[in-house]
From Swiss-Prot:
Descriptive protein name: Chaperone protein FimC
Highest taxon of source: Bacteria
Gene: fimC
Record's subcellular location: Periplasm
Keyword annotations from UniProtKB, A to Z: Chaperone, Fimbrium biogenesis, Immunoglobulin domain, Periplasm, Signal
Known outcome of mutating residue 29 to V: In strain: Clinical isolate 149 and O2:K1:H+ / MT78
GO cellular component: outer membrane-bounded periplasmic space
Family: Belongs to the periplasmic pilus chaperone family.
This protein's record includes keyword Iron: no
Function: Required for the biogenesis of type 1 fimbriae. Binds and interact with FimH.
Length: 241
């Protein structure tokens, strides 16, 4: 290999390392800012049918920063949806303060009443900047917190705490299908086939979700789910169809 090619390759490696370092630094800065900045009071919102409103707490843990808070709801496909209204939709939040978002039902009973419906609650935190300190190289990062919002009809056929144990499984050569016969969304985590860890899955009510299955995966299926409070349920053994 010529010296010219060696130098080009070294230059490319140095550039790649620099870019990787910059991206890692930015990720650390964002993570630190998110931890010190704005936090939500829940990991999911359950909206019972017939309720006038549901509340979500928002806290600014950063004593020295003011944030502009913007909130909205999206449907399951990630498109803004007016069937739930968030108020206030936009407000300024000073350091060490807490505010409450009110989520209002504007669905007019048009959603299915035999199962849950999935939406996404979005809260964007935009940090304020001192204009006197701004330069051409200033990078302003807005952080969006996105959590599930479940619309839950009244009088569903099964209590929510019994749904996880009803999950069933169907295995093929290279995939595992999770079958949910209940009216609730099931967030499945710590899914294992023998000693192989499989990907997490969100299984819709009265529906299915499929995950990849390694060729050397064992036959014993175990899993846990996340309940209404964001906590893990006890480990369960999968029942095959």
């Amino acid at each position: 290999m010529s010296n010219k090619n060696v130098n080009v390759r070294k230059s490319q490696e140095i550039t790649f390392c620099l870019l990787a370092g910059i991206l890692m630094f930015m990720a650390m800065m964002v993570a630190g800012r998110a931890e010190a900045g704005v936090a939500l009071g829940a990991t999911r919102v359950i909206y019972p049918a017939g309720q006038k409103q549901e509340q979500l707490a928002v806290t600014n843990n950063d004593e020295n920063s003011t944030y502009l808070i913007q909130s909205w709801v999206e449907n399951a496909d990630g498109v803004k949806d007016g069937r739930f209204i968030v108020t206030p939709p936009l407000f300024a939040m000073k350091g060490k303060k807490e505010n409450t978002l009110r989520i209002l039902d504007a669905t007019n009973n048009q959603l299915p009443q035999d199962r849950e419906s999935l939406f996404w609650m979005n809260v964007k935190a935009i940090p304020s900047m001192d204009k006197s300190k701004l330069t051409e190289n200033t990078l302003q990062l807005a952080i969006i917190s996105r959590i599930k919002l479940y619309y839950r009809p009244a009088k569903l056929a099964l209590p929510p705490d019994q749904a996880a144990e009803k999950l069933r499984f169907r295995r093929s050569a290279n995939s595992l299908t999770l079958i949910n016969p209940t009216p609730y969304y099931l967030t499945v985590t710590e899914l294992n086939a023998g000693t192989r860890v499989l990907e997490n899955a969100l299984v819709p009510p009265m529906g299915e979700s499929t995950v990849k299955l390694p060729s050397d995966a064992g036959s014993n299926i175990t899993y846990r789910t996340i309940n209404d409070y964001g906590a893990l349920t006890p480990k369960m053994t999968g029942v095959m169809e």
